[in-house]
Amino acid sequence: FLDDLRAKLEEAGDNPRTLLNLRKRIAKIRVFDPACGSGNFLVIAYKEMRAIEAEINRRRGEPDRASEIPVTNFRGIELRDFPAEIARLALVIAEYQCDVLYRGQKLALAEFLPLRNENWITCGNALRLDWLSICPPTGTGVKLQAEDLFHTPLDQAQIDFENEGGETYICGNPPYSGGTVQSVEQKEDLEAVFSGRANSWKSLDYVSGWFVKFADFARHVDACGAFVSTKSICQGEQVARLWPIIFQSG
């Protein structure tokens, strides 16, 4: 989708109206990584989108304009507490770095503090959680909110998407784990995903669970998705066991 945005920027040239429409489109895009680790994919997506937005503002003669891309539109799920906090902090830092780069240090510092305490990175098991509650089509999701940036989230709170109605892109690098090396917990995760769908799921790679969860998510949200995965789910015996389930999901 970043390539498409860059192509649209090239097509827009210096046309103010076309550039404005592209900026509005970018501001509504949601990026969701249900295996986000320390947030690398989310940070890259955010920085690349800010670069495109900055070029739009430059061409429109508005170089100091505040960004319209909400960092809370970049959401993730991470199993472990510490990487989840790192992912959230990495996005906060990325926002500050982009503000310094495109608007100057003075304006960036004025808006950087106090640090946000919203927790748009969910710490939990992506194969057990309802993705629609984390990245919902309506724009509001039930989220865990911490008392401060580094505190373990305890209470449920809602965080609105600041710009609703945009495109949703899902990406990630889920754990692979072949069928013969999965832990008991991972087998139970896959059973929760495939229960009622198939009986011959035990030999599937662990990453296959993310594809099925995305297929379920895409039934309710007009979304595009891509995961880094093992080639074995696209060849050999796993193809017949996994892909019919995904295709049947629509």
Spans of model-derived segments:
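SAM-dependent methyltransferase catalytic region
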Residues: 1-250
